[in-house]
Amino acid sequence: MSHIFASIEQLPPDALFGLKARFVADSRPQKVDLGIGAYRDENGKPWILPSVKEADKLIHEDPAFNHEYLPIQGFASFVSAAAKVILGDESPAIKEDRLVSIQTLSGTGSLHIAAKFISKFYKKSQTVYLSRPTWANHFQVFESLGLKTASYSYWNDETKSLDIEGYLKDINNAPEGSIFLLHACAHNPTGLDPTREEWVKILDAIKAKNHLPLFDSAYQGFASGDLENDAWAIQKGVEVLETPILICQSFAKNVGMYGERIGAFHLVLPTPDNKPAILSQLQVFIRSELSNPPAYGAKIVSKILTTPSLRNQWKQDLVTMSQRIYSQRVALRDLLVKLGTPGNWEHIVKQQGMFSFTGLNKEQVARLESKHAVYLVSSGRASVAGLNSSNVEYVAKAIDEVVRNTSTKL
């Protein structure tokens, strides 16, 4: 007997998690996972950061540790420390009390809160401009709340570099007051970031058109190994822009606590006016969706950010991860050059962060998976964190084979 839900359309599985499922099911011993964005150590294993281990020990030794509900706004110490790490201790937004912050379910949850806030309260535009390409989930997050999406130029496929001219042109051509999502650092999927000089031009163009900037910061400290450097674009935006600034912050990657869903949403206002009203609306969003955010991860990150010795250890952990990833970029580039693989592979070392936008097309990616058990996202994005000294030569030879034996046309 049929029922009222019998006609619901079945959707295809999520591309990234579908890729992971195929990898897990693959019995070939030489398989390599360059798909999902999670750090791996030199042995290809998940790495619990030393700073996280010590913070976990300290919070469990605290007699006051418990599993009580957090306030709707989140763990206060975490929310405050998270704002300072991304905006800077001396941020005028913090000192002038014109910042509204709330704990979220990592970066995706923060983007969801931002999207909900925009859809309800931003009347100038309901279109979010996303870089071309961008993280695939951006589209779902915004469109699920009724917002429209459009794109702006970012990646030049021919030169494997940033299309800054097209980027600025699209900012200028967008209707005044449009919403622009900006990757703060370690752009996903390209790994290619604007220079500081280019960021100044981008921010000036946004200011001239009175656009609403929305920064997505998922990799602070993970891109360059330096927290301040990776937050530079956001802090410069706070300095020069006159519109509100929305910031979505994740601690999944940079503390390696992917499954704990630790994040924050920050709204920098031009003046402190109406802060209590805005916070009250954000609290209703949280209360109606998850009641209050999870405590454990927030307490770990708070302990790291507010304990000088742990914060210093965390900074070293970030250097360890970023340097290992960069070393694998160099190794892969050098091996491809040594093999004489057709094409120019310098873009691999010019990119930063977890990912490399390899330039491989869908046919080549499919052949890597079927013939060599090397798993990449169909766009050609590779998680460099999945490379190590034991598999990088195998991966280079696999790439060499598919480039030589498939079409170079997309």
Question: Which ranges hold each PLM region?
Answer:
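Conserved core segment of the aminotransferase class I/II
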Residues: 239-316
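Short Gly/Ser/Thr- and Asp/Glu-enriched loop/turn motifs at secondary-structure junctions
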Residues: 97-98, 348-353, 377-380
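N-terminal "arm"/small-domain region of PLP-dependent enzymes with the aminotransferase-like
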Residues: 2-74, 81-84, 288, 294, ...
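Basic/polar N-terminal segments that are highly enriched at the extreme N-terminus
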Residues: 1-4, 406-410
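Conserved core of the PLP fold type I
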Residues: 58-59, 64-209, 220-222, 228-240, ...
